[in-house]
Structure formats: structure tokens, C-alpha cells
Amino acid sequence: MQHQSLSVRNSSGISGNRDENFPSVRSSKVTVKTASISAKMAPHTQGSNLTIKQQYQPHQWPWNTSNNTNATNSNNVQSNNNSSTATSNSSTNSNNSPAVNTPTTQNQSQPTTQQSNTALVAAAAAGTLSVTAVNKLKRLQPTTHSEASTNTRSNSTNTIASGAKRIRTTNVEKVNKSVGTNTTGLSGPPGLVAVGSSLTTSAANATTTKKLTQMAIVAASNTSHHHQQISTAGTTTTTITKNAKNFTASGNADLCNANKITAGRATTLKTTTASSTTTATAEAEAEITTTTELMTTTSTVLQQKSIIKTGPVKTSNAASLEKYLNLLQQQQATSITPATTLKKVERKTARIAPTVSLTRKVSHSPQGGLGVGQPKKPVTIAPRTSDPKLSINYNQQMVATTATSAISTGNQLIKQQDQQLVKSPQSTVLLTTIRIPQQQQQHQQSTQTQQQTSQNQSQPQQNQTQAQLQAQQQFKQVVQQQLQLSSPPRTPTKLGSAVFQFHPQTTTVMPNLVQIPNLVPTQPVSSAAAKLNAPVVASSTTSSPTTANLVMNNATHGLTATRLNNGTTQLYMNGAVIKLHQIQQQQQQAIGTAGQQAPTPQQSLPMDSATVSMGLNGLLTKSATLSTAASTISTNQPAHQAKAFTLHAQKPTQLYQQANTSTATAYTPQPFFMAPSGQILLNTAALPTMLTSASLQQALVQAAQANIPALHPLQPSQPQSTQLPNITAIIQQQQQQQQQQQMLPNFHQLLANIPQAVLQNLQSTTKLGQTPQFVPIPSNLFLNPQNPVYTSSPSSSSFTSPITISTSTLPSGSTTISQPLSPPPLVATVPTYTTTAKPIMNTLNNQKIIIASATSTTSSKPPPPIKPISSTEPPKLVPVQLNKPSISITPVISNPPKLVPPSAPVPKLVLSASVATKATSTTPIKDKPKPNLPMSEPPALAPASCTPPLLTAPAPLPVASVPSPVLSPRAIDNKSPPALNPLSLDCGSSNDSGIVANSSDTEDKSLTIDLCSPGSPDSTPQKKDEESRQESTPSPVPSPSPLSEPPVIPAESEPEPEPEPELEPEPEMEPEPETEPEPEVEPEPEDEPHLEEPKIDESSEAVELPELEDPQPSPPLPCELPPPPTIETDLLDTLSLPPSQKSPKSLLLEQIKLKLPDQPDDQPQESMSSDQDYSNQSPLDESSPTGSAEPSESQRSTTPVDMSPPSIETDFLNTPQMTESAKSPILSQPKTIRFPAQNGVHHNFGRKGFRRLSDGRLFGVCYWSNCDAQFDTSSKLLDHLQIQHVNTQTGPFACLWDGCKVHNKESCSRRWLERHVLSHGGSKPHKCIVAGCGMRFGSQLALEKHVNHHFNNTDNASAGKRSSDPPLPKVLRKTGKKLRYRRQPWSARRFDFFDIGVMEGLQHRLIMAGSVASARRGTVTFRGQAAGRRVTGFGAEVFVKWYPREIISDDWIPEAEVTSTREISIYELNPDQRFELEAQLKTNRKANAELLFCLHELNLKLQAEASSTSCSRSSFSSSSSSSSSSGCSSASSSLISTPIPFNSRTEPKKLRKPPKQSYQPSSSGTTSSLSSVLSSSASSLLSNENSSSSSSSSSSSSSSSSSTS
């Protein structure tokens, strides 16, 4: 549907162009300039006397606005071509709403591409409110769209523009742009929406002013239909339909999408103008609706008409401020939220001030023309402050969505929630102007006041919601949005600006905003769902003044769960869903601490992370189905908007009551899923799961209550007094809600969906006065659909799992929750964590969720640390994340893939975060608790049992505990748990806290991982390396051994001893914290393998067996400083730090290191073999050889120089020398110098070096007959030709140049010959006559000029410096530049990689090689063994087998010629034989030594028969040869036997084989006997230079070797 541009309504007149889709009222101020809105200026709502600055949301409006954002008087093509665009507009208005809006606007904008002339819009809006793109009244864009519809509409352009801007809106950028005004980073309009809602609800009077318009926009943004309205300004019905379709994303709502958008906006306006609803003024108010369209969704058309009727909205600018205040008051009365109204008024005032001072100074007076230009000034507008109140906007949007249609709410909830998560931190900034109270509620800072306000607001909102749900869900949305604007409590808004704030909250302001945004996603998906959701939202957000507190904790926990269960109010946050799950997990942990989260998990269990994401679609789908009903209801809803809003406010109480009364019913709603189309679908299969999850949560709650004390310390963070008022408000609201719910069956359904346990948890949380806003509700509600998925954390504790789920599902969701409560929970968490390792770990899991959601919640239910699935991790995570709630949680989400958490809770911090990050998609919560202390963790813990005390110490540190979830991805990899750091006690304490701290920095996942990494602050780099190696070769079996063997590992080569000692003190305790739920793990290292495996299983994404195993070995390594360097592979694997998991790269590096020579002098052969074994067995973690190899590897890294020094070649091959050689680049590259150093011929011939002529001849070479002279330069060649070949001729003159065309053709002209030879010798025959100048020129004239320059004073100095011969080729000279390309071969000579060091090394190696080849250039001595004898015609023959075997063939030798040894030059061996010889030298030396030694014994026996003279001679020759080649026989000696490891003959071969350890050559005297033994044995390289004595030496060597042996 294309929206025709809406004419600006004068305050007095109704006439004007209206959007085709809906007759939304538009005051002149309401008129939105598309161009100006497109501009990145905060939209302004200006009355004649009132200028309302809207939060600057350059990204939000873009959905509706065309790409042109720059000109006040510019034709902006606003096209809502795709539902995503429309949603973006809504998201701009509200953080949470965008998700829903995107579908709605998208539907509208696709059909409608509106170009709005900003100037025209401003002119039209002169009478009423005019919104300019500069002012950034993106919310008011509907008017712009209406006007734009007048102009050419281009769907493609609009879509692009919307998409581009929309992206901005989705981001947190907008929050940053407007300080005071932008409450939500992405939904600047949310603040305005709140105001707009009031105005809309009260009458069109306030709508007249820009502020009113902005308020309407804010409401619309909450509804996240603002852009949709812009798109649908022309056609009310169409817009409504599109909104429904967008939210629902179902074919059913295709017709209703535009109506839905309009209806949503109208609903908001209706709520505001419920009292002054008049059909007569519907047309005039269509434009106002454009301003406030964002607020209205399903019933936007009728409501907008009513708004248009409203005189105040239409009133001229002069009356805008007064009317705006009046409207606010009216809205307050309607919604029964006086405090909210006051806040709205304040926001208006704030907006007015910012409007003038902001980006562009546009006069506050509402002028049609100015409207275009004004949008710039409201970059930071008070209305944006509504954005900070994520919960309020969210609630409002929720209500509006419910009233308008479940479909609209579905998409809005999804996107708005994501945006809200993104923008939640910014909501804090926006709080400064108007939205501070709401934001505080969200943040629990102004929890009490906001709770009270929420109560006031929520009741009217719930009432309105009921009426709206009955009449029109759209109106309900409008009312909610308006109430949100006016009242801090975040009532069920449409997930508009509030929801968009989610992301900001996740970052910084997350604690409060995040909490509410979590609730925000719980928007009704269908009319019935909307009704149910609206009460739930109202109760969750509006029920308590501190909507963020109780709503987030209780309402969010319970209501959100019910929404998820119902599928109507499922908290489908676009990006917030995951965050909500994380928050839910945290909240669940907190509630588990309070003992209230059992019911919440029940709700959340039915919904998986997939269910949540799918549920969003399903919710949208349902919304589409319900959109028609919502539209039908929307007409009647105007009067009931206030009631619906009130119902929402009261809904928490009703929710609790109904949950208590009908837990099964609560589970039934959980089956509702969001279909990809956006509809809510009931999953019958989910019913059993819901029931099971409900029972599970109860059981978890009971189990977790034991750990509540640990969690309790975390909870005190929030003042109980603040929560208590919330509780009172909630109770009052509950009563109202019960009444209203009776009126509205949907509310009852929603309450029924909420489990009794959830309601009880909410109530108990409120009683505790811990402001469990986030923890109770969000964790379960958000996780409700996917508890099984998040089971890893829920299993530990029902409460925790929802939070964990939210964390994993929404990167910023958990952060959002943690913000408000983060500081206090840290302390509490730390104590709990410190108190008991396991309880602490459990607490960490629970607290993590609590902290992520809110620390106060944890305090509320302090008693037992929750052992629930994710409870283990929260304690650490909670403290860390509290510091940086938004960031820390988000990182956790990002990390989830790495996390092993589900099955490896051992790294509690990491695990909790990772589990949350995982979004609990891998395993149900139940499963996680067991693996919670990752089975692999316990061994690590045992080695690092010192860690538990450290954990206790870090527990206080856990201020960064919250970030611990962030750590999860890396923490699991590098360091299993922050607190239960397998690394070492240091890891446990400082590392734990450090990990927590890093975790708190959500952005710094890597930091978190590093802290947790095996080389934590305590562990040294080597330690990390070892851990990485161990990880590379994890061995599940060794896990039990690590505890027993930890001492051995550290000694091997880890500078980690320092951290290790810490771990040693309490090896058992460490496991406990890690496996908080499972005490068994801590004491028993044996469990480690089992835990390890489960851990791996649970962390399907990030966790790998090596990673799990690594954490286990890690802790032992730290504790094992004492053990000797030699450690078996099993021990090493076991000792490998669990936290430091090796990536494929690290594994490869480890293997490479293993292959590198790293053998101590004491046992070179063994080390070599062990290295080989390790490299071979490294994949097998359990193999003991690997263990030994690992120590050697660590030694290698520690003391790689420990190679036998005597052999240069070996040293050179050793790692250190290799490093040196690596230093000279040429060693690894071709080592040929490109240009000869002596001559610069190449230089003369340009870049190509020696160039060739066309005939292929080289330059510089004289091809004259009988002349082979060569010259470096062409100049020299020309001189040679002139002097030797031309001047010598007396005539006739002939050219004797080979190949010359005129070869030997006589000429009578010497001058001709002189010119001719220039073609052969060069093109520049004329040489400068000045001494020292070798310049040549092609012409005499050029030479003359040059020579004259020599005598010019100016050129004298420089002329002499020039090179004698310019080597420039023609190609270079063609450029006209005097190129001196390579006068000197600088590139080759300057960068010669054969530097002095390299040459010395080569020389040394040559010397060593010479010693090896001193005999006959190197020979191999084979030992022969007589295997048989035969008699032939020629005589007796003996069959001799030569050892080593299979290198040379065995043969029959005449008996008289049989010798025990045989020397063969290595150069005489064929390639196959040489290959076999190399293979022999590389084989296990021990085995070869034994075999060779046995053969040697046989040879000795044979040699005994030899003559004594030959024996003595061989001894002498062998000694001399061995002395000459002391380093050459080490390889053969190693092959022969271990007893001969020092044989020098082996050295050269070893040098050639880097992997083989080099052995120190023995003294020459000793070497002689050893070398003889080696030569007799077989694989030594003989260095004897005398070939004549080689035969005798072979026999004598065997005899001498026998004597030696």
C-alpha cells in the first residue's frame, strides 16, 4: 500500500491530505518531513509555542524515511517497501518495537513508497505539529509519508533508504546521538512515544504541538508502527493490515498489515485520545496519527481519526505546549498514572529545550516550513528519554501490540526487543530529560518510585489494555505507549523504543533497561494473545513502579514466561531474545537463590532458544491471525485503552495469582511459538514439556533454595525498600488486573499461562524487597520456550536456566538484566562463592544469571546458592558482570560457541556464560548441572584445589563475575572456569577475579579468555604453552591421574610453578566450585574424565574433548611444580589446564614443537624418542609417551638450547639455531644472488639484469669477429668498439659484428662505421669529455649542452656526482625522466641474506661435514651376521645378513671373504637404500639400540675369529676416524643402542634430522672405541678419510667395538 503524504493539519483545521491507509490525525506539527527525518537530526515535535525534540534516531526513521535525509525542503521518498523497513521505523521509535514494526512498516512501505516534500509537510503542519527530518521526528514520519505519498513514490528507493536508516535505528547509535532526548539508543522516539501516547490518549489537543506529535511518535515507536503509520498515513485500513501482517508475518494479516500499522498507531493515539475520540475529526487527525501512528497499531485508523478529532493535537503551535501538558494530564487520567503524566510533561519540556539547542537551531514555533528544517535540532530530545525507559516503552508497546493485534506485537516484540537490548544502555542517557524515572525503574535505580508509578500506570494501562484488547489491541498498544511515556514504569509497550533500548542496556545501562526489555518482548502475538500479553506486560512492566525490578524479575520472569507459554506475550526480542534468555538464566539463578524461580523455569522450559526465535515467528504468525480480531477490537478499544493499560499494571498480581491457581494453564501457553511468518502457533507437543518443565522448575527451585544463601549475598545489591514499593504496586495492580482479566479472557489466559510457581516467585521476590525485577520473570519467561534447550543452566536451577538461556540466546539480554543489580550482587555472589567452592560455583551460575538480570534479585532469595544447572557458574559471573552488566553479558553470548559450559560447568564463570551463550540449545538444563562442573573440570580443580580458596578470594573480586559468562567461550578454551581455574590457585583467585573482571568487559571476550587461559596472571607463558600442548593432546583417561600425578608435570618444564603451588593447597576444593552442583567432582579426579566427556557433550558448539581435557590437566600442572621434568603423557594430559583449550592452530604448533629437537643432554636418545612418540601419540592424550613428550616439549620451549652443542649442524637444526637462520630471510628462500657483485652490467641494462638484444645476445658482450670481450656497461663496450675495432681499421671500413646485416661489407667512410657500431654497442655514442663524468648522449648536440653545463657554476657541483654510465634503457628514457635505476646493485647487495652469521654457520657446518667425510666422504658401516652356509661348485659360501636390515641386500659371500662389517659410501647407495637408511636413523633408537646391540654381540663373536693384527689395526683406524668425526656418529650410535648415545659419528646425521636429539660428542679417546662400536653396529657414518684403511677399519672397528662393549 502506498501512503499518500499527509498534509499537515493546522491546529484549527482538520482538512489536509491523509494517508490512504488510515485517517490518522496530523497537526501541522505532527507533519513529519521525510527529508528532515531522513537527516540524522533528532525529529522535533513542535507546537506553535512548543517544540518537542525527539530522540535523535537517524537509524530509526530511515525505515519510513527515504534515503534523502538532508534537506528540510526536499522530496523524501519514504517507502515502506519491506516489512523490515517498517520494523526499523518502529525500532527507531522504540527499542523493542522495531521487531514488530519492521514487518508492519515493511508491508506498508513495500506497497507505499512516499516522497514527502519536507517543506510541504512543514507547511501543512504549520497549524499543528510539524516534524522535520532534521528534528529527526522519525516517529512522526507517517505524516511525512502521507505528504510524501503526494510526491512520486518509489518502492525501491524507499526500501533502500528505509533499510539504510533502519540499520542505524537498530544500532545503539541513536541513543548515543541524543543525550537527554534519546532515551533508547535506537528508539529516540520512544520518549516521544510515551508523550505521544499521553497526548494521543487524552485528545488531539496535545497532538497539535510538535511535542505532542513527538509523543505520539514515541507511542508509535513503542508500538513500532511509526514508520508504518508514515507509510500508511494515506490509507488507514491498509496500514493497519500491514502492521498486523508485519508483526504476524503471516499471510492472514497481509490485508491487515497496513491496517495493523495504522491500528497500532491509532491504538496508541486512541489510548491517548480515548476521551476525545470523534469520528468527525478522523480525517483531520489522520495526520496527527501519522505523528502518533507509531503508537497505534491495529486500530490506528479509528483511533487516529479520533486523535485527529482531538482539537489540542490540531491546535496551532502556540497552544502546543499547553495542550501537550493537558494531553499528558488527560493521558495520565486515562491510564491512571499521574506520575507517568508528569514525567511525560517533563519530557516535553526537556524536549523543547533540546529542540532549539540540538543539531539544528530551528525555531520552536511550529512552522510548516520550519518543520522541515527543525528535525535537525531534536538530535537529543527529551522524548527520547522515553527510550531509556525500556521497560515502559516495552510495556506500552506490548499493550499496544496486544490491543492492536498479536501479529503486530510479534514482529515488533522481536525486533524491538533486539533493539531494546541494543539500546538499553542508552536509555540511561535519555533518562536525563524525560525518561529518567522510567529508565531508573528499568535500572532499578529509581526502582521504588518507578514501581509506584508503574502501579499507577499499570492499572490504567491494564484497564486500557483490557478495553483495548476487547475493543482493539491497537488502542491497547497506543495506551500502553502513552502510559509509558508519561509513566516511568515500563508497561506492556510494543517493544518500540523501549525494546530498542535493549542493546544499549546490554552495553552500559543494561541493568535496568535490559530487565525491562526482556519483558518488552512479551507482547501479545494475537488478539487473544495480545490480550493475554497486554495484562502480562502491564503486570510485568507496569505492575510495579519499578517495572524493571519486579517486572523484570517477577513480571518478566513470570509474565514473560507466561507470554512465552501463551506464545502471545512471548518475549521475542529481535536481538533481545537471546539477551532475554541470558537475563532469564541470571534471573532464574537469582530467583533460585530466593527460591522463587522454580515456577519461572517451568514456563521457560517449554520454550527453547529455537522456540524463542521460532516462537517469535510463531508469535508473529499468530498475530497475523489475530490481527483481524485486533483490528475489530481496536475500534472499541479507545475507551478501554486506559483500562488495558491499568490491566497491564495490575497484571503482575493477577499473573501471580493466576499462576498460582493455574500452573498447568501457564504451561499450556508456553507451547505458543513464533512462526517464521510471525504468527503465534500453539505447539501441542510443548504441553508435556511445559508440564515437565514446571515440575522441573519446582524441583530445581527446591534444590536451588539450598544454595539460596550463596545467591542471597548477591541479591542485597538492590535496596529492598525499592522492591517493596514495587511489590505493593504489583499487588494493587494484581487486584486490578484480576478484575480486568475477568473482563478480558486473554489476560486470564496469560495469567493461566504463567505458572503458579512463577507468580509465587514474583511475589516472594517482591516481599524480599530485593527488586528481583530481572531475575524472577525474565529468566523464566524468556527462557520459558526454550528451557530444555538451555537445560544446561536450568538444570542446575530452574531460575538460573532461564537467565542463562536468555544470556545465551541474547548476547545483550543477560547484560541488560545484570545492569541494575550488578554491583550489589557481586558482593553477595563473592561471599557465597567464597563460602563454599561448590555452592559458590552453583551460586555463580545462579548469580551469573542474577547478576546478568539483577543482583538484587539474588539478594532477595539469598538463602541457598542455587545448585541448579547454571547456578555453579553464576557466582563468579555475577560479580564480574555486575561491573559491566551490559557488556559482560553480551560477551557471554558471543562466546557461547566456544563454551564448553553445558557439559563443562567446571569453569564456572566460563561455563555459566558459555552455557548462556550457547542459548541452551545444546542440552536441557537438567543435563547441564551434572556436567556443570564439567566432568573434565574436576581433575583440573583437583590439581588446582588451591583454587577453591582462591575462588573464595576471587569471589569478592567477582565484581567482574558477570563477565564470566563472557569468558565462557574463551574461558572454557583457555581456562575452564574463572573461579575454579584449573590453571592454578592463582587462576582460581586472581585469575578468577580477573576472569570475572574481563568477563564484565563484555566487549573483551579475548581478555576474559586470557584471564581464564592456562597462562592466567599467575601462570607463565610457558605454562600456557604447556596447557595448549596438553589441550592439543587431551586425554580423557588421564583425568583421574592428574590429581595423583600433578606434581610430576610442573617440574618438567613449566615456569608455571608459582601458580601451581596455589592450586596445590586445595586440589579438592577446586573441583567443588567448578562442580558446584556435584560435590563428587571436586574430590575425585577420576570423575574428571567423565565430567570432561559430559562437558564436551554439553558444549556442543565450542567445547571439544581436548578443550575439556585441557582444563583438567591445567590445574594439575600448576600444582605440579615439584614433579620432575619427565612426566608421562597421561599425567601431562591430565595436568593440562582445562581452561586453556587448544585451537587447531595451537595443536599444530604443539605437534611441530614436539617434532623439534628438544632433548636434555642427559638422555638425548630417550628425549628424542619421547619427542617422536609424543608427536606420534600427541593425538592420544592418554598415551604415556605423549606425557613424556609434553614435558620435553615444555623443556623445549623453556630450554630449546639444550641441544648437544658440539654438532654445529645439530645446533643449527635446533630450534634456537633455526630461529637464527629464520632471522636471515634468505635461508628460507632461494639463496642465489640475483646480480653479480663484481659488475653492474645488469645495471646498465635496466631492471632485467643482463638484457639481451633482439637477436638474443647479451648486452655488454662484444660479438666482433674473434673478440669475446665483455663489459659491464654499454659505454665501455662502445669505447672498446671505437678503440679496438674502428680506430684500428684504415680502410676500407667494414663491420665485423657477428649477425650484423652489413657484416663484412666494406665502406669508405670511417664516420659511417663509427655511427654504425653505436647500434651494436649502445645508443649513446657521445661520451662526456669531463673527467669523472661518464654520461653519454645520442647526439652531438646533447653532448655539447651537457659539457657546457659542466662549466656552469650552478651545475658544477652536482654534475660530477653522476654515475659514469647511465644504465637507462630506452623504455625508461621514453618517459623523459632521468631515471638512475640501478647504477648500483643496491637491492641485491644491500639485502644479501647471506650475512656474516649465516656464513659462519655454513662454514662451521662445512667443517663438521668435512670431519664426517674425512674418511671416504662418509661411509655407512653395516654389521654382518652369518645366517647360513652352503657349498657350491666354487666353494663354500656364507649367507650374510647386513644390519641395519633392509638397507642393503643380503648376499652369499665366499667363506674366505666373509667380514663382520661392510663399509659402503653413502654416495654409493641407491635412492631407495638411502631412504631406508634415513628411516632407520629416524626410528625408535631404543628399539634399534637393543636390536643393533644384539647384532653387535653376534658380530663381536664373528670378529673374535679375526686375526689379532687386523683387530689392532681396525682399532687404531677407527679411533682416528672417530676423533675426526666426533659429531658424526651420534645418529648411528642412537640407532645402535642407548649405551652409545655419545658416539660422535651419529652427530652429523642427527644434525640433518632436526627432530632427533643431538648428543654431546665424547672425547676423542672415548670416541674411538665408541665409534668403532658404532661402525661395527652399522648405522654410523665413518669419517675415516683413508679409503685404503676403510676395509681394514671395518673389520678392526668391529673387533674394537667388541672389545669396547
From Swiss-Prot:
Region called Disordered, residue ranges: 1-28, 60-117, 359-388, 441-468, 856-877, 917-947, 991-1213, 1352-1371, 1511-1605
Biased composition (Pro residues): 1035-1049, 1112-1126
UniProt feature, compositional bias: Low complexity: 64-117, 1135-1149, 1511-1537, 1556-1605
Compositionally biased intervals (Polar residues): 1-15, 991-1000, 1165-1201
Skewed-composition ranges (Acidic residues): 1053-1090, 1099-1110
Zn finger intervals (C2H2-type): 1260-1285, 1293-1320, 1326-1350
Family in the record: Belongs to the AEBP2/jing C2H2-type zinc-finger family.
Physiological role: May functionally interact with Polycomb group (PcG) and trithorax group (trxG) proteins to repress transcription.
Name of the protein: Zinc finger protein jing homolog
